[in-house]
Amino acid sequence: MPVGGLLPLFSSPGGGGLGSGLGGGLGGGRKGSGPAAFRLTEKFVLLLVFSAFITLCFGAIFFLPDSSKLLSGVLFHSNPALQPPAEHKPGLGARAEDAAEGRVRHREEGAPGDPGAGLEDNLARIRENHERALREAKETLQKLPEEIQRDILLEKEKVAQDQLRDKDLFRGLPKVDFLPPVGVENREPADATIREKRAKIKEMMTHAWNNYKRYAWGLNELKPISKEGHSSSLFGNIKGATIVDALDTLFIMGMKTEFQEAKSWIKKYLDFNVNAEVSVFEVNIRFVGGLLSAYYLSGEEIFRKKAVELGVKLLPAFHTPSGIPWALLNMKSGIGRNWPWASGGSSILAEFGTLHLEFMHLSHLSGDPVFAEKVMKIRTVLNKLDKPEGLYPNYLNPSSGQWGQHHVSVGGLGDSFYEYLLKAWLMSDKTDLEAKKMYFDAVQAIETHLIRKSSGGLTYIAEWKGGLLEHKMGHLTCFAGGMFALGADGAPEARAQHYLELGAEIARTCHESYNRTYVKLGPEAFRFDGGVEAIATRQNEKYYILRPEVIETYMYMWRLTHDPKYRTWAWEAVEALESHCRVNGGYSGLRDVYIARESYDDVQQSFFLAETLKYLYLIFSDDDLLPLEHWIFNTEAHPFPILREQKKEIDGKEK
């Protein structure tokens, strides 16, 4: 109500009282213009303003839920490891970025899902965040100022010592005896039809590479419709993702000229001294992984040096109270943080759980155990935690070392953690028995709580949210068919055949997700509810971004069973890629796999060259090209040799 309408009631000087005031007010003449009346009016206005100010302050205190976090942030501003993450939108989507850029296997939750479930999750997350923030604030306030200062100084000293050691490490790499790689002779298949199909896949690689070279050379990825470069925020200012990711595919396919071009660019231009924030996971699997495999295949020293240099740059990500690394790292300052959307600032299982293979090889090639120690610390933390129903939630807080939201997935956010448990055991020449036990214990829990069979007989892997199942399976989850089959070798004899059959069932389900689309390429996610089976029902799940996981499973199933249907299914994918994804400027993902009219996303992902085309090429090659008895593929399809000569050393470290 306007203040002016009230003043005549209190400012009549003539003792006319309330009635007089009303009369004056209605008559339109404002009485009470004398000094005494002015003082009363002024006091009343000031009283109202003061009341409004008090109300505003109280409301701010009451309605700002993050005030305790603000306090915590101010007190800890000198300690990056304890500083809560700033509000930030992580690119386009989610494995944020994953939903649109297609590669952060663990980041699918950045995209909106079911509104009801999302609201409930958000409320639970808000309550959890508030409780955690209050606890942190209380703990902080209980500390004496000198204790806080001591903690800050200790952390600074630790960082300085680590940086000094890292510089010493990079100054002089020890000499290593390069062993000629096993199984890289690129012999032609005896069968003429298979030989012709393999040649076609090599031509696809040539088309993808030449257009990247023509329109986006030195940049991270290609926009094949626009015919220009494309860079995801996942890589910060680091350049050349496609060059590094494609190195081993070029080598394996015998594209020697292109391999030398890539090597020359890396030697001259690949620079990690950038002031930018990167995804530790993505940089590790693509850049570290690509450089390591290029070294092991070619013996070129530049690749070893660059891999170790980058590994050193990533070490500050581990400067957390628990040793669980941050998801994001500024390459210059060494300051890390987590994705803002990740369950109260948690680290993500598939991200911190997908460092083991690369970091073990970094220690092997550098002679410094620090890399192996970092990933073994992650395992120590995980083994001390209780697992709900034997399952590993997707979120773990790096400060408290405790689980975040209880969401379990073998697809986005969780997938490659399980893959790396199995492959850590295999890569150690089957001496890492701890990794083997963790893998089979996890698989048993997955079978009990997540694996289901539809009414139509399709086996699928659901997601687990606080004890409730969401009957959805992502394209990313389709890698698990190959994982189960590969793990059959280490299972008890009575279970080995079971795991081969389970892998075959997952392969069939994922093939059905392809076969039930118009373009014969699978959607980002597909569901088993409401009478629907292996079909995407939501528009934001109908896209295909040149992903490799289904073809990855075909490759393992072919190598382990030699059932000809896997080559048939792989060739169906080749024909679909050529019909619907190939354009003049390269290969593009699709926005909707259920419609006839192509709607391109205009991105040629680097993993299309690193994974999709490599797995297709291996399916139509003989088994002695990169034989599984000698090579382990990281989650970006970069082959690493099994560390046979390091058997005793690794066994001793991991006990």
Swiss-Prot record:
It comes from the Eukaryota. N-linked glycan at Asn-515 consists of Man(6)-GlcNAc(2). Ca(2+) binds at T635. One of its GO terms (molecular function) is calcium ion binding. Glycans are attached at N515. Belongs to the glycosyl hydrolase 47 family. This is Mannosyl-oligosaccharide 1,2-alpha-mannosidase IA. It comes from Mus musculus (Mouse).
